[in-house]
Amino acid sequence: MKELIIPNALKRGDTIAAITLSFGSAGLFPHRYQQGVHQIEESFGVKVIPTPHALCSPADIYEHPEWRLDDMMWAFKNPDIKGIICNIGGSDTIRLLDLMTDEHFETIRNNPKIFLGISDSTINHLMCFKAGIRSYYSASLMFGYAENGGIPDIMVQNTKKTLFETTPIGELPHSDTFIIDFVDFGASEQPKRPRILTDGPRFIQGTKTVQGRLIGGCTDVLMMMAVGTKLWPAPHDFDNAILFLENSEERPSPDYMLYWMRNLGAQGILKRINGLMFSRPGNDKFTDDADKQNWLATYPKFDEVILKALKEYGRDDLPVVTNMDYGHTVPQLILPYGAMCEISCTSKRIAILESGVKERE
């Protein structure tokens, strides 16, 4: 993998830009947006400000992808902005790509700073990767950091360790519960969502300890929009990497996971990587509790198709971990692109061996 520029650490008192690069949720649900702003400011001692168009209506955001790109450049160029967080994901960030020139990528590269996002923001992470800077796969402002009842403590501690400290991140913790139910951003009351017990990460294949630099994102976005574009990483960027993947809330089935895995195999990516990590599959479209239980019962089926595809492509030796705390369920740990990660199949341990950020010069 190519070497990435590492952004400076955050400090209390810093200003963070909240940006809308896909769906205009912040303009549609201002109370949810403000809840996320308040919880981030209270938990980390930073100031959150919107980019110029971040609070526009969904219709205006959709009609003006150039506004979104302008906001992204504004945030990277502004020396007072020390970090950028996406308000939410969506489905059309890819429309910004047609507007981007070499100058836009140079702006990102010449102004490295923390960039946070999830889901459709995978496209923006690939923009940062192409520009040559580290970005951070994380919760968004309105999903995760705006969680009802406060940001989960495991996320607060992980965010501080990853973005505010310059010592190695170390072993990734795991939560004994997770949240998957739909949250109505527009509801007048925002009660705590129910938690589901979990045993934590599942080490479903592999017998050794491996290391590799992190690369990945939302599988739906990677395999249905990014692949084949100029954002798709070069083959050598997957060499000896640890690939992290996660499914969106659109509830793609295990069959889709099998198709996507076969695509990775056909590209030769599965043969290049040192390890593979998956979050819990997301889904916020339950019709009732029985539907939710049926969905949770599919988790082992995802494991089965992952192993099936790996066997088809001769990688039944590859260390694989599923059921991890990132992606479209809460809590969501931060995964820094390009950071050296270690998977130990014997000790059932995942660690990031270096710091997420660097000291300010």
What do the PLM-derived regions correspond to, one by one?
Residues A18, I84, D120, L222, ...:
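Buried hydrophobic positions in well-ordered alpha/beta secondary-structure cores of metabolic enzymes
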Residues R134-T219:
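Conserved anion/nucleotide-ligand pocket segment
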Residues D80, F105-I114, I133, I273-N274, ...:
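A short helix->loop->beta-strand "cap" motif at the edges of active sites that frequently abuts
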Residues M1-D80:
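ATP/NTP phosphate-donor binding region
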Residues D102-C128, R134-M142:
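Short, acidic/small-residue loops that bind anionic groups at enzyme active sites
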Residues P254-E361:
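C-terminal active-site/capping subdomain that shapes the small-molecule cofactor and substrate pocket
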Residues L214-P254:
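Oxyanion-binding "anion nests"
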Residues F76-T101:
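Long, hydrophobic/aromatic-enriched structural stretches that serve as scaffold segments
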